[in-house]
Design a protein with these regions (language model features):
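A late C-terminal transmembrane helix in Major Facilitator Superfamily
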Residues: 165-197
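Flexible cytoplasmic inter-helical loops of multi-pass small-molecule transporters
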Residues: 10-30, 230-231
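Extracytoplasmic gate region of multi-pass secondary transporters
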Residues: 39-92, 182-187
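Hydrophobic core of transmembrane alpha-helices in multi-pass small-molecule transporters
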Residues: 134-149
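Intracellular juxtamembrane helix-capping segments at the cytosolic ends
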Residues: 149-162
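Multi-pass alpha-helical transporter architecture, strongest
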Residues: 5, 9-11, 157, 208-231
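C-terminal ends and interior cores of transmembrane alpha-helices
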Residues: 116-131
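Cytoplasmic membrane-interface "Motif A"-like loop-to-helix N-cap segments
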Residues: 104-115
Length: 231
């Protein structure tokens, strides 16, 4: 993977828009300072992206721990990992699908639709977390499909929130803050909720709150599909 990553990076070139900015001396020396006027865009990008990471860590980390250690009777770790390996295929497929449709229909249309579907999933899907291969596979496959739908367009809509001179800094900061907000504490929060309430459905309510925050942010973000980015 390191060799493949290095090969790809060595063969990548700067975008025409960035090269034009370099030629016109519009590249800033202190991008974080220049990013300050765009703090609203950073926050909107962070909250719009947050549910993606919450869903990822609930599906990929917390649910494994729950199925192996808490569920009665439990799955073995190998059994649950095998189910995750199969269901993650849906993640890859829906990244591809939603990338295509975000170019056709717009980023907001695809993301709002997928986030609404994630909200509905959050409210009902946790009931399927029981020792039943079919229901768990349904939970994982639908969950990873939704995560792919949320993750796919992020490479477009996050950079498109910002002008050229702070585009990478703004997108990178939003992306990584979303990872902290949505992902860093998701397994711990989920475990604490189940422990305190005794109900696995409480994890779904947590995901529903994150979905609502993402929806608010998405409604406030302007559609960017047809914007002129040479500015």
């Amino acid at each position: 993977l390191v060799i493949i990553g290095l090969y790809v990076r060595l063969r990548m070139t700067e975008t025409p828009i960035f090269r034009k900015a370099v030629e016109q001396d519009r590249v800033v020396k202190h991008p974080l300072r220049s990013l300050l006027p765009y703090w609203k865009e950073v926050l909107l990008g962070t909250f719009a992206m947050g549910i993606t990471y919450s869903l990822f860590y609930v599906l990929g980390t917390w649910s494994l721990s729950y199925a192996v250690k808490v569920m009665k009777p439990p799955f073995s770790q190998n059994e649950y990992l095998a189910m995750q390996m199969v269901s993650v295929v849906f993640f890859a497929i829906f990244i591809f699908v939603t990338c295509i449709y975000s170019d056709k229909l717009g980023r907001k249309t695809v993301l709002i639709s997928t986030t609404l579907a994630t909200l509905v999933f959050s409210l009902f899907a946790m009931q399927s977390l029981q020792h039943n291969v079919l229901t768990v596979m349904l939970f994982l496959c639908v969950g990873f499909a939704l995560m792919g739908g949320l993750f796919g367009p992020c490479g477009a809509y996050l950079p498109e929130l910002f002008p050229t001179h702070v585009r990478y800094s703004g997108a990178g900061l939003s992306y990584n803050l979303a990872a902290i907000l949505g992902g860093a504490f998701a397994p711990a929060i989920s475990t604490a909720l189940v422990k305190s309430t005794g109900a696995v459905e409480s994890v779904g309510w947590y995901l529903a709150v994150m979905s609502l925050l993402a929806l608010i942010a998405l409604f406030l973000i302007k559609e960017s599909k047809d914007e002129d980015y040479e500015k």
